[in-house]
């Protein structure tokens, strides 16, 4: 029996036990997990260092190494996020709708767990904890399949989580890690219809596209983040500089960082040069159109492929546009429906942009870096969905539930 099949069977048994666990027991288990992450910090960091060393030997980019790295601060943040989940309302059992029929039937639509959730993801060990704890809070079992680049970190984290579950009333088999990171195990997950209720990919465009293309299991798609900021003609210069610098440089390797800035030509004439200099001082490589390269000779001429690239690095493409309609057309052509922003003092233009742009999150005068489960008050997130069915945007607890109808009667029959 393959590792995938064996662990899927265990997860399936565990999910049947989880549906009977009250919120108090789930929260207790989460508290044990947060405590264990803090207590076993040195052990986790030692295993993470093995992944970092191997990544450097393989020539991983600084952006990839940043996503892979755990630090004491990041582990504390992860533990804090787990504890936050204990304070959030449990969506399972929530009544969505009630109907009382004339014949006496009482119909209730309630939230229920999805069942067994499969997670396939890349070099992000924090996803291991996010996925496991979100699933546990919502009564789901989870099968985790990370990448080979983070295998030591993932094994350490899952070991800590399962040890914490041993102390709790929850089954430790509710959290499974596929340790074989070969392509074969990924393909097995894609077609595990009798073992998985849903599969969630979290990573780069190539991974997500492959899962969507090849999976026969229902997929909750988390999209790549080729995010834009459009600086309208009336944008305040100081605010525009502050928001653009934050959205690009605070953490360039994440999906809600911007990759392209579109600048209204009326704003560009007076203010763009100062913005370009600020970006360059912040260590950002600028790839610009002809107007941008004229203002900043050190800028690299942008190629067509740059407009559609999610750099996940301190690199930004910048283009001047004639107005808001050209900016929206550009976003429609190259955007990934993740997060898009307009900076403007013109309320009509803001309304037009927010209505016209098709994305999971659209912003007016704010950084795209806020598209995040924690920032939205969801605690940790399972991913950011760019699709429209079931869930869209940061997926917190409610996104990991479905619903069912409970009908109560006293002998009614249909005539």
Swiss-Prot record:
Keyword Mitochondrion: no
Subcellular location as annotated: Cytoplasm
Gene Ontology biological process terms from the UniProt entry: L-proline biosynthetic process
CC per GO annotation: cytoplasm
GO molecular function: glutamate-5-semialdehyde dehydrogenase activity; NADP binding
Superkingdom: Bacteria
Enzyme nomenclature, EC number: 1.2.1.41
Any single Pfam family the record assigns to this protein: Aldedh
Matching InterPro entries: Ald_DH/histidinol_DH, Ald_DH_C, Ald_DH_N, Aldehyde_DH_dom, G-glutamylP_reductase_CS, Glu-5-SA_DH, GPR_dom
Family from the record: Belongs to the gamma-glutamyl phosphate reductase family.
NCBIfam families for this protein: PRK00197.1, proA
Role this protein plays: Catalyzes the NADPH-dependent reduction of L-glutamate 5-phosphate into L-glutamate 5-semialdehyde and phosphate. The product spontaneously undergoes cyclization to form 1-pyrroline-5-carboxylate.
Protein name as it appears in the record: Gamma-glutamyl phosphate reductase 1
Organism the protein comes from: Bacillus licheniformis (strain ATCC 14580 / DSM 13 / JCM 2505 / CCUG 7422 / NBRC 12200 / NCIMB 9375 / NCTC 10341 / NRRL NRS-1264 / Gibson 46)
